[in-house]
Amino acid sequence: MYRIFISHSWNYANQYNKILDFLDNGGVKYYNHSVPKDDPVHTNGSDKELEDAIEAKVKGCSCVIILAGVYASYSKWIQKEIAMAQKHNKPIIGVKYWGAIRISSVVDDAASVITNWNSDSVCNAVRMYAL
């Protein structure tokens, strides 16, 4: 079973949920290693507490999935999550959002692979790159 950390902002919950659908529909057996939305650290914790919670999740995961949209280049959290994944030698799977013409150079440079926005691409990347 893969332990998958999906980088996300709850502002982009639809994309996050679609990644979960891709994994479910693609037959990948996984444990969602992301920090849950209802975890109090999101609303009551400091940035440092959230960072520590994310790092604990990344440290124990098989791979990190990051949406490779251009917005990722400007997200302080995605850049921190990339640094955490690299620190703990976790493969990064970048997912190019459907219809996107450009992707984040930050994600592109850090990713082990960039996949297309579909279940087969995402699931094949997990099977190939996850530890």
Regions from the PLM with identified roles:
Residues 70-87:
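Conserved TIR/SEFIR loop-to-helix hotspot centered on a Trp-containing motif
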Residues 47-51, 79, 119:
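Structural motif corresponding to alpha-helix initiation and N-cap regions
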Residues 8, 68, 96:
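Short beta-strand/turn micro-motifs composed of small residues
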Residues 99-114:
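Glycine-rich, charge-decorated loop segments at or immediately adjacent to ligand/cofactor-binding or catalytic sites
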Residues 1-60, 130-131:
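Conserved N-terminal substructure of TIR/SEFIR domains
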Residues 123-131:
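A charged, well-structured terminal subsegment
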Residues 88-95:
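A short helix->loop->beta-strand "cap" motif at the edges of active sites that frequently abuts
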